[in-house]
Every structure is written in structure tokens, then in C-alpha cells.
């Protein structure tokens, strides 16, 4: 179908992704049919306006004619011919033509205007609704993607897929559909008019169509990779802007404005360079298509003048032919120039479908425990983030009892956070297995598995919403009293009292209205409210001052009673009360025991503790 619509310019393979997206418009087929009828009305009135010239010149300025002989017609064609002659006489042949002709012209223009408005409105409406549905599905797909995908894919690329490419694919489709149908109908109608007026001259006009098709094919092939690179560059620019916005404090603190500007300028120059290529091709395409049309028009005028001098055609027919051909020029030009936006549309559709086809996070679990007891075991677990053979965890084995508080300590890169990320399956092991209450976590449904954990990470993320909604995010059915209790447990009563809005005060994008310690405590309150059987605290108290840390530590002590807790900490003073301390290095456990036991061994933990003690003392002295 696409080959016929584009006269062989694009093949079925080019439009595979686009045709897949067109499934989204099926619910609106009635509106599309109505738009097609309106487009047909535009084409019909446009064609008749060209044919309007011949009777205007041949009959409009002559004396009223005698009524046509409407004898009994034999057959459909004769009947239609009688109707046409009767209509022509009613408009052009009577003495009333001084007002019937202008009125008829106004009616034609009004009908064309109504049809044009209807087709434009309906197609735009379908376009907006289709974009909305595709973006909804893309967002739903994004929610199913793995943590690894989000870590490896720049945010600018995701934004480009969901915003730019969706808009380019569907909005261009609406415009192109209108152009292809309306202008093809107009060209077809005008061609019929030309054939009716003078079939010999019409052959010359028809000959320019293959030339225009070859011209469009040339520019399509030339710009395919340029348009694709341009779309990728826009994604890179989105990423640069997002990173600079999110990291504005780092940019300002390290005087990185020049570096940020250089990054942006480099991407911007690439987009400008590619845009120039597209513009040059578009600008060059129009003059060449105009030249072909002008040559055809010149040949037509030459032959028509010769025919007129030899009595083969009337002045009215000649003028109508020229007007029809001139009216044909604009739609032909639109059809000839459609290859570039069509190429953009198809490539954008490829990007959208590629995103929709991204494999979701694997969830082969079938078990759905309501609430686990909290016994955890790691068996021969390996984790490799890269393909160079370096393991984040190497033959890791650990058993954690129900209600036990286990602290993971070690240098950066020793694998502490990897252990925490394995439990909710943010990271998948390369080998080995992990069990909770004797059940392999791979056999538990992801939503049920993650319902067993409350996580507070050192990388706090808060939503641009109120304090109340951010805390309630972990339990949407919680009431104000429960949220207030969680905030109080996280030592945030003073924050509530400081604002007349209390719980419902806005906290800004990612908690921009809060201090670093307050942001951390809001995340802790969110974890407290969830009341999960297993707590994962990844540097949860790293941003708190000493007094706040003491109060929050007390709240966490009460919260972790009869619950399993895994604590990751660099500040070893915060893990002294843990039931067991796991000392890690190079993805392996090298020591474990209570604080007193490890200090008595005078090993690796003691060295880390001494270093941590010196750092703490230095901070307190400062």
C-alpha cells in the first residue's frame, strides 16, 4: 500500500514500524473516513474551480443561450450529459447569470473552506489522541524496564523517544496523510479536467510525474542517514541540558560553566551542521521540481498556442487548461517535496518501535508471599557488571537470620551496595542464587518481592510534590496520622512546624526546598512508613549532623526490632551496635563478627575503624 501511495518512492520495509504505529489510529477510523470525505470535497471543489474558467470565458460574456434540448436520454451517460447541460444552462445560459455565476463561485469557495477546516480539525484531533496513546504506552514500557537499562541509557535519549520522535512520527503522519490524499485527489481531478479539455496536452503534463518521482527518490536516499544522525544529536542535546540542570550546583561550585557551554556548543554545532544539510537538500529540491514543471508548462503553452492558431481549441478551453495546470503546480510540488518529511517520519517511527520493543525486566516468578519472616541467604553469588572478568562479588556466601541487623563495611568498590541491590533484583547475579525464607528470589514475583523491602539510599530521590505525598509514596493508603508519626520518628517535626502548610508544604524538585539532612530524613520517613519486614539502609545516615543522626539512629533501632536489617556504612561509628558486621574487600567477605570481636582480632576492620576514627576526630576538631 505504501508503495502505491508514494508511487514507489518508499517500500514496505521502510514503513514497517510506521504501519505498526498506525494501529493506534484504528479506534478513530470513523473520524478518518469523515476527514477523507472532507478532503475529497476540497479536491473536488479545487478541480471544479479550474474548470470554472472555460464556461466563464466561452459563455459568461456572450448573450443568453437557448435552453438545451433535453430529449429522452438513452442510457446513463446520456442522462448525465443532459444533467450537465441543464446545470450549465442554469448557471451560464440565462439572463440571471450576472448573479448566479458570482453566487456559484462563492458557494464553491465556502464549500472548499468548510471541507478544508473539517479535514484539518479531524486529522489534528486524531494526531493528538494518537500521540497521547503512544506516549502512555511508552511510559508504561519505561516502568517495566530494568535498572540496568536506566543506568546505561542517557535520560536525554529517553526524553527524545517519548517526546520528539513520537511527535515527529504521528504529527508528520497526519500532515503527510492529508497531503497524499488531498493533493493526490486534486492532481487526479485536475488531470481529468485536463484530459477533458485537451487530452494531447495532458500527456505532456503526465510525463513530468516520473521525473519528479526520480528527483524525490534521489533526495530521500541522500538524506536518510543525515536525518537519523540529526535525531540522535537532539537526544544528546536533551541529555546535556538535563545533566546541566540537575548538576547545576556542581557546575557552579567547580566553575564548570565554560565546560558545560563547550559541551552544549559541540552538540549544537552538530545539529546546525546536519540541519544545514537537510535545509540545503530541501531548498535545492524545490527549484529542480519547479524547473521540471516550468518546462512542461512552456511546452504546453507552445503547443496550445499552435492549436489555437489552427482552430483546434477555443480561448476558453486554453485558459481553463492553463489555470488547471497552474492549480496543479502547488499540489504537485507538495507531493514532490514530501519525501524528506516522510523519511523523518519513518525513522522516528523506527525509534519509537525500538523503544517499545525494549525487553522488559525479567519476571519469571510465580510465588507471591504476603509477608516474609526475613531469613536471607546468599549462595556462591557472582556479579559481573562488565565483560572484562572483574567481579563486583566473587563467590559470595552469607546467611542472615530473621531479625538480625547486619552491617556491611569496607572500602568503596568492595561490593557492599551490590549486595543490597541484589535483594530487590535491581542487579541480577551472574552465578549462584539468593533465598529469602528458603525461597529463591527468582521464583518470587517482582512486585511481591520488592514489597518486602524498605530502602533508604545515599542517593535520595524525592518527587516534586508535597512533604505528605512524598512520605506516603511508600504506602498510598496511609492517613495523615501515620505519615506524621513516620516524620516524627525521622526527626522532622521541626520541618512540619516551620511551615503554615505543615504536612502539605511543597518540597520542590527532588527536595530542592530542603537541606541535605532533611532530604535524607524524608527518605527515612518514607521507609519507616512502609513497615517492610526487611530494611535496606545504604548510607542512610550519611547526610545527618551528629544530633539528628543520634535521634534517627534511635528511631531506626526501634523500627528494626524483630525485623531484618542490612546496613551499608562508611562511617563505622554508626554500625557498632549491629548484631554482626561483615567486612568486605574485592567482592569477598574477609572478616565477620561483632564490633568487639573484630576489634579484638585487630585485623582489617580495626584498620578501617582507626582510619574512620581519625577522620571523625578531625571533623569534630574542625
UniProtKB/Swiss-Prot annotation:
* Reaction it catalyzes: ATP + H2O + lipid A-core oligosaccharideSide 1 = ADP + phosphate + lipid A-core oligosaccharideSide 2
Protein's name according to its UniProt entry: ATP-dependent lipid A-core flippase
Q: Which UniProt keywords apply?
A: ATP-binding, Cell inner membrane, Cell membrane, Lipid transport, Membrane, Nucleotide-binding, Translocase, Transmembrane, Transmembrane helix, Transport
Regarding domains, what does the record say?
In MsbA the ATP-binding domain (NBD) and the transmembrane domain (TMD) are fused.
Question: Which family does the record claim for this protein?
Answer: Belongs to the ABC transporter superfamily. Lipid exporter (TC 3.A.1.106) family.
What is the role of this chain? Involved in lipopolysaccharide (LPS) biosynthesis. Translocates lipid A-core from the inner to the outer leaflet of the inner membrane. Transmembrane domains (TMD) form a pore in the inner membrane and the ATP-binding domain (NBD) is responsible for energy generation.
How does the record classify its membrane topology?
Multi-pass membrane protein
Q: Which residue ranges traverse the bilayer?
A: 32-52, 91-111, 192-212, 286-306, 312-332
Domain ABC transmembrane type-1, which positions?
33-344
Q: Which Pfam families match?
A: ABC_membrane, ABC_tran
Coiled-coil stretches are none
Q: Which organism is it from?
A: Neisseria gonorrhoeae (strain ATCC 700825 / FA 1090)
Q: Give compartment(s).
A: Cell inner membrane
Q: What gene name is given for the protein in this entry?
A: msbA
Entry's Gene Ontology cellular component terms? plasma membrane
* The keyword Transmembrane helix appears for this protein: yes
Record-annotated ABC transporter domain positions:
378-611
Q: Quick one: which residues bind ATP?
A: 410-417
Q: Tell me the superkingdom of the source.
A: Bacteria
